[in-house]
């Protein structure tokens, strides 16, 4: 499994990740740490794609940053649409019970895709981007700066730029302007 490389490097990588997490939080002193569509490890510390593949070797260990933020009392918000995202550990058992590959996976670790990384606030939505846009809209409204929000037309341009750069729609597996199966027009409308 891809996570075998990580396990072989083990303690050295773990300590470095923890050290960097502390340094980042010390330097930035954030009021909140928000994870959007960010894979979180399961109870075996393996990161999975939604399909159940081990993606640990290509996933930065931001779980340590998130856990350190929680330990310091910094607000953590997790935005997800499946249950493998950081911060969705609040509904880990529900994900294991109700989501394909929630309790099992294709890599053989035996932990499933359900993340064990919890958050203070979990925002579950049909598409993670939409949840993030909702947070941005609330913050912009509170600050009285709605003009900082992007338009539906900008959303379409961003989606097309992603496709032009090679991003696949994960539902169809095709190079088409969709986000999690939803056409660009629907995504623009949400904005």
Show where each model-derived region lies:
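Short, small-residue-biased leader/transition segments that mark boundaries at the very start
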Residues: 1-6
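Flexible, glycine/proline-enriched loop segments at strand-loop-helix junctions
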Residues: 7-12, 47-57, 121-125
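Proline-aspartate-enriched helix->loop->beta-strand connector
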Residues: 30-31
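Short glycine-rich anion-binding loops that position phosphate/pyrophosphate groups of nucleotides
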Residues: 38-41, 82
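A short, gly/pro- and small-residue-rich
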Residues: 43-72
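Catalytic cores of nucleophile-dependent amide-cleaving enzymes
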Residues: 63-95
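C-terminal functional extensions of proteins
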Residues: 85-191
């Amino acid at each position: 499994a891809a996570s075998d490389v990580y396990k072989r490097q083990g303690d050295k990588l773990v300590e470095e990740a923890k050290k960097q997490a502390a340094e980042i939080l010390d330097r930035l002193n954030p009021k909140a740490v928000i994870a959007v569509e960010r894979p979180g490890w399961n109870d075996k510390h393996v990161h999975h794609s939604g399909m159940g593949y081990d993606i640990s070797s290509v996933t930065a260990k931001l779980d340590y940053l998130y856990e350190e933020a929680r330990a310091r009392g910094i607000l953590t918000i997790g935005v997800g649409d499946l249950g493998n995202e950081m911060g969705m550990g609040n509904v880990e058992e529900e994900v294991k019970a109700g989501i394909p590959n929630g309790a099992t996976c294709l890599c053989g670790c035996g932990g499933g895709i359900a993340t064990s990384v919890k958050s203070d606030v979990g925002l579950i939505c049909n598409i993670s981007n939409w949840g993030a846009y909702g947070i941005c809209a609330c913050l912009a409204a509170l600050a009285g700066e709605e003009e900082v929000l992007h338009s539906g037309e900008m959303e379409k341009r961003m989606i097309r730029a992603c496709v032009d750069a090679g991003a696949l729609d994960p539902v169809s597996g095709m190079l088409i302007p969709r986000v999690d199966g939803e056409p660009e027009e629907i995504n623009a409308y949400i904005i």
